[in-house]
């Protein structure tokens, strides 16, 4: 079975550092990243454009992050246009692949991306928004992607903000406490 780079880094380096820093009695108390949620909210376009948009979004996320994901769709009709919400849940190996690509390749290339503050950590969960995730890619539905805000939620197993902060800072996420 293929082990990705971030998972081996967690097992060999981060787990050991957290164990020595906080003196856990049991190794199962050491926090880890449970899952990653990506949401795209309030798309308002005609129904044919929405499904083409969804198809291209799935293709792009598969090509960029090499993921297979489960998406939940919520459609509400508003006269001629529709309100469309998309939620992508990444678990186990997929969230490590996504975080590895996000931290090492895409966050440094996003224009005007600031360091995340401690206010984005709530009960051990990190929430942040990215306005222009697909600025690097140019294709015919670029106008649809430029207007959208991607909300990324990283859930950890700890409820303590300081433990979550130390875990995420060891993953080299740009976060300031």
Locate the predicted segments by residue:
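Ribosome-associated RNA-binding proteins
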Residues: 1-177
